[in-house]
Amino acid sequence: MNGQKKKILLVEDDMALSAVYRSRLEIEGFDVREANNGEDALSATVEYRPDLILLDAMMPKISGFDVLDILRNTPETANVRIIMLTALSQPKDKERAESLGVDDYLVKSQVVIGDVVARVKHHLGIQ
């Protein structure tokens, strides 16, 4: 990557899974910050100003769907790229995320970490 590292906010309440994703993203050259619930995700987005957010859907305090809705309706965060990475595999869940403005929707059981990294790079315009 050229110049400054791209910033990723990883929002995941499963600490073990979060550690795996963080490690791989850092190996790939990203600056990664973690949030463990929706409330922390909102404050971290304002403070950290990430280039992309990997967002779980099912979390304590505020769901990923609500975080997505709030971010898309806040002028300062409306254009941040957001990939929802979730266990929810029903079409209605993906449709809900798309209606709220998600950039990509990945089901955890259907992807490996390399797929996630590839989608992150794609959305950040990295080869």
Describe the predicted segments one by one.
Residues 12:
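Conserved acidic carboxylate
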Residues 15-33:
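Two-component/phosphorelay signaling modules centered on CheY-like receiver
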Residues 34-43, 64:
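Helix N-cap/capping motif at the beta->alpha junctions
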Residues 43, 65-78:
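Short amphipathic alpha-helix used as the core "switch/output" element in two-component signaling
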Residues 59:
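Receiver (REC) domain active-site loop signature in two-component systems and cognate sites
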